[in-house]
A protein has these predicted regions:
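Acidic, histidine-bearing metal-coordination/catalytic regions of metal-dependent phosphoesterases
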Residues: 2-154, 175-176
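Active-site neighborhood of divalent metal-dependent phosphoester/pyrophosphate hydrolases
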Residues: 148-169, 174-219
Length: 219
């Protein structure tokens, strides 16, 4: 009886010691790190809003079969901006920290975020999303080209005006050619590069396109 009581006491002491060992390191960590670990385990994030991520786009790199530049903007400052990418149909993903900068156009302040994704496999379907340690955008497709032929759309000057013509042209072109590998806009992209409204209008014309088909922009 005494031996059984001794063994039970020893087991309870061991359990208490393990709880303390696993709890104290978490208490020593910054709160956001602990929260992020919990969210990562649960794979649950709030959806981003325009304050967190908008005008998301893919940018061509020197070798788009193995790398891609992802860019987006936020209204709010975000020092924890990141991109997340995975092969389509898989759960395992890679998180890529973004570099951030701030700029002001015509009195409108924007925070620009850039994530460089490398080590991709040619001819593979991926999906990505952007955000921070608490929020993520919906998943969006990202395709890496295989060796061989490709197709592209090449646009001249957008002839901006109110950008309605540019929007109609771009949307019809991508509707007629949904499988292009990338597109080029030779410029001018906008009439006034220091006017926030014009950039918003240019990106609005490409909504549903530029986040899934990479662009090679020429200012």
């Amino acid at each position: 009886m005494k031996r059984r009581k001794y063994v039970l006491t020893a087991v309870m002491f061991l359990i208490a010691a393990l709880v303390i060992c696993f709890t104290l390191p978490q208490l020593a960590e910054p709160r956001f790190q602990v929260e992020n670990k919990i969210r990562s385990l649960l794979h649950r994030y709030d959806l981003t809003s325009r304050a967190d991520a908008y005008e998301i786009r893919q940018i061509m790199t020197q070798d788009p079969s193995t790398s891609r530049t992802l860019m987006w903007q936020s209204q709010d400052e975000d020092n924890r901006a990141l991109a997340e990418i995975r092969k389509k149909g898989e759960k395992a993903s890679q998180v890529v920290p973004a570099t951030s900068s701030v700029f002001t156009d015509n009195g409108v302040t924007r925070h620009l975020h850039t994530a460089m994704v490398t080590g991709l496999t040619p001819g593979t379907s991926y999906e990505y999303r952007v955000g921070n340690d608490r929020k993520r955008s919906p998943w969006m497709p990202l395709e890496t080209p295989a060796q061989g032929s490709f197709s592209a759309l090449i646009f001249p000057d957008s002839q901006s005006a109110d950008y309605s013509g540019w929007k109609a042209l771009a949307q019809k072109a991508f509707k007629d050619h949904p499988d292009v590998s990338f597109f080029v806009n030779m410029g001018d992209l906008v009439d006034n590069g220091e006017h926030a409204y014009q950039w918003d209008a240019w990106f609005d014309a490409l909504q549903g396109v530029i986040e899934r088909i990479p662009v090679a922009p020429l200012l």
